[in-house]
Amino acid sequence: MGSNDLNTWVSDKLMVLLGFSQTAVVQYLIAMAKQSKSPGELVRELVECGFSLSGDTRAFAEEIYARAPRKTPGVNLYQQQEAEAAMLLKKQKTFSLLEADHDEDENNVKKQSASKTGKSDKGQKRFRKKSEQLEDDDDEVVIVREDKRNVRRKVSEDEDDGTESEEERLRDQREREELEQHLRERDTARTRKLTEPKMSKKEQEEFVRRDSAVDKGDIESLRKFSWQEYMKKRKQKKVLELKDDIEDEPYLFGDEKLTEREIREFRYKREIYELIKKSTQEEDNVGEYRMPDAYDQQGSVDQEKRFAVSVQRYRDMGSAEKMNPFAEQEAWEDHQIENAALKFGAKNKEVSDNYEFVFEDQIDFIKASVLAGDNYEDEMHAKPSQDSAGKSAFHMLQEDRKALPIYTYRDQLLNAVKDHQVLIIVGETGSGKTTQIPQYLHEAGYTKLGKVGCTQPRRVAAMSVAARVAQEMGGKLGHEVGYSIRFEDCTSEKTILKYMTDGMLLRELLGEPDLGSYSVIIVDEAHERTLRTDILFGLVKDIARARPDLKLLISSATMDAEKFSDFFDQAPIFRFPGRRYPVDICFTTAPEADYMDAAITTVLTIHVKEPLGDVLVFLPGQEEIEAVEENLKHKIRGLGTKIRELIICPIYANLPSELQAKIFEPTPEGARKVVLATNIAETSLTIDGIKYVVDPGFSKMKSYNPRTGMESLLVTPISKASATQRTGRAGRTSPGKCYRLYTAFNYYNDLEDNTVPEIQRTNLASVVLSLKSLGIHNLLNFDFMDPPPSEALIKSLELLFALGALNQLGELTKAGRRMAEFPLDPMLSKMIVVSDKYKCSDEIISIAAMLSIGPSIFYRPKDKQVHADNAMKNFHVGNVGDHIAFLKIYNSWKETNYSTQWCYENYIQVRSMKRARDIRDQLEGLLERVEIDVSSNANELDSIRKSIVAGFFPHTAKLQKNGSYRTVKHPQTVHIHPASGLSQVLPRWVVYHQLVLTSKEYMRQVTELKPEWLIEIAPHYYQLKDVEDATSKKMPKTSGRAVV
């Protein structure tokens, strides 16, 4: 379209939309359309210029965007000459490929000339004479030409190989960029930006009404609506004028005598105003029922009070209960009995004998030191609070918030956040950092600019803290306050305070590298120095430099915060006290041989001899917690009713949310609660009522050997910093005691000062893939607080290159970009990506989901171990391998409509299966995101196995003569785990999911493979000599030496 035609068209459109048109406006709109990147951006600019946000405006923006010519970069003379030279060089290269044919043609000509006859001797003599004269010169020229041709052949062959590999790399880069563009477009389409201008409800209704009227051509309804709106405004204006006239009458004419006409007119105005006022009041007091608002005294919504009545009245009775005339009476009695047993089971217990128990293996403790409290004297002399029995639960929560140590420093903290972009916050666990700081920022107005994000190192902490904050704010979890963890997202468009694991924030960085939807980022529990927290430090540091409007808060519970301050460019440190009461520290007089048995004895001794107060026991892991719980219950049953009620509450990561919440429930009067927890209770969770802490001095720490690729989760001694954190848990609500099950000599001489950061003792493959996806290629110069071992980085890069996630230049490939979208180990992600080739992606994501939940699928009750083992063997019929057995388990559970009873019958943990289902649903959604079709090929087990081998080909092992296995790459002796279905079969070649070190080097989740698959799938990784079977070779006969 020519420029004149475009100007005429825009002018006509302006007449229709605005009713006027000018040349300057037309030229301005065309220039705006040329500079806009998309029609949506052009619509926003038009609305800012005064256009109405309607369908006509959108259509006008799209059409002018399509008609406006785009500027194309001009080609200067130098670039044109370079392009011509490149084309000429390419042409010359193509000529060199025909030299072999030229030589053959010369040979053919010589043969034909030799066969010809009838030529005269005179001609031959002349030819011979001329050729003799030029023979010397021609020989030299031919030799030079042949040398040039040979060199040109070699160069062209090398250049062709390099050109092909370079073209392949560029093609892969283009495909990866297209995939990233598609992912960004999907994210943009599904995500609503918080910074976009939002219309009010009234404006939305008006826009919908006008839009529908324009579509129908109903201009008359628009006029009617406009007249109605005008009359409402006119009525309000006239009433105000009448009111002003009545009020001004005595002031203006108070001293003057009015005529009868003026008096009648004044009375008439007053009567009219009174009638209008009376009618308005009657409209406000309409005789209709309105739902009462459930607000508390401070104006916040009390959701508990709001829904309490509806929840209590509802009862889902079965058909048998409805036919029972005494159903309501029985339900009431059951409810009363349940309340009585829950609340008053230990309060009114009769004390029959008040003997002091003496345990055979009682432990002797010595009081070594006292951990002093802050403001302890003020707390002791403070006046007792008034009785709060009549106050609402919401009001009690607000009082609890004011009782936290951080409340005193609220204004100082907000001023510090306002004055500094990066702030290091130091306060002990339980001071209210995690729950209160995001609420303070919300109250200060930071959520108007974007969300407030708070990272947690553990899933349990993110869920429990988000639930607590939602309760304090009087809202429902998932609305204003939400959480996001791996395979579970409890947020909505209304969410302004978002708690998440540090890994989830890393995944958000893939789609939003600048974190534009956030106004504040809080990195909580920074002192734990987890793997992803250390990665976040370097990333948010760069983001804060690029975004001056972003506030960055680093929260730590340790007093040694200078290292964080130095890393974040000498950021200021904000400290406030957390512990309010002193804690007595007791050490054992001699080392303990069995820390679990010593912990049980210490708990029972505290329960019998010490005053009331809850007990917190730190144990390394889930297995230890379950063992201690069972032994405690057994000993309590033996003591009977001679002791008080002891409530045992475990807490660990795999525990369901409803069971995790029990640790926060108040303890009944007269009873004692003992919490068995992992090191999650050191800093991430604050449990009220804890007065005694039992610290065995051990925790489970993951370590990784990059040379062998073996991970081990070993029970190791804690550090002094962790011991101090554990001790501080006892001084929250009253003076407490900490019983350390090790000697003072061990504490001062054997324990390290700080825990080794996780980044220096774990597998870095997933982290390297994430950093590559974020565009960070120079990993050795990445800003780590504590750099990881260079050997671990190199091994991770080698693994990603072998999997095809990186090319020879270390750049991310299209397959690698797809792998980065899955929140899984790179090998599992590669297995899913390759499944598209073998048309079995539906089965592979089921296997990946089952592998992600770990080995906690089957359970073996002590009294039914044989039945549990037989149930497990039923899924391994045919020696299909552990991966196919997992697929059978999931499909069988799916066929029973996800039955809980089926899980009980087959000794399978329902909680693990439900989690696997959630993981699979998310993986299925990610398949569509990375443009992989969901296909099923259940009958072809070889295709499924090949997909598994394609992801885990570095994890292969070969059977040895002694019954053990030896890994093919980086040879070492390993064994099949006893829980595997192939532990008694011993196939010759296997591929394994994980290599762990317990009592031996065990392979977990094993599947048989054919050795030729390794050459077919990974020819770049395996050679024929690696997969040749040495047992099938016939060795030569040799004579052995005689025994002397």
From Swiss-Prot:
Keyword set includes Nucleotide-binding: yes
Catalysed reactions, semicolon-separated: ATP + H2O = ADP + phosphate + H(+)
Tissues in which the protein is found: Predominantly expressed in flowers.
Sequence segments annotated as region (Disordered): 99-134, 152-211
Segments carrying motif DEAH box: 524-527
Domain Helicase C-terminal: 599-775
Biased composition regions of type Basic and acidic residues, renumbered to the chain: 168-211
Keywords: ATP-binding, Helicase, Hydrolase, mRNA processing, mRNA splicing, Nucleotide-binding, Spliceosome
GO cellular component, one term: spliceosomal complex
Sequence ranges assigned to domain Helicase ATP-binding in this UniProt record: 414-577
PROSITE patterns: DEAH_ATP_HELICASE, HELICASE_ATP_BIND_1, HELICASE_CTER
Composition skew (Acidic residues), residue ranges: 157-167
Coiled coil: none
Traits of the deletion mutant: Embryo defective. Arrested at one-cell zygotic stage.
GO molecular function, one term: RNA helicase activity
Any GO BP: mRNA processing
Biological function: May be involved in pre-mRNA splicing.
PANTHER family: ATP-DEPENDENT RNA HELICASE (PTHR18934), PRE-MRNA-SPLICING FACTOR ATP-DEPENDENT RNA HELICASE DHX16 (PTHR18934:SF83)
Family, similarity comment: Belongs to the DEAD box helicase family. DEAH subfamily. PRP2 sub-subfamily.
Protein name: Probable pre-mRNA-splicing factor ATP-dependent RNA helicase DEAH6
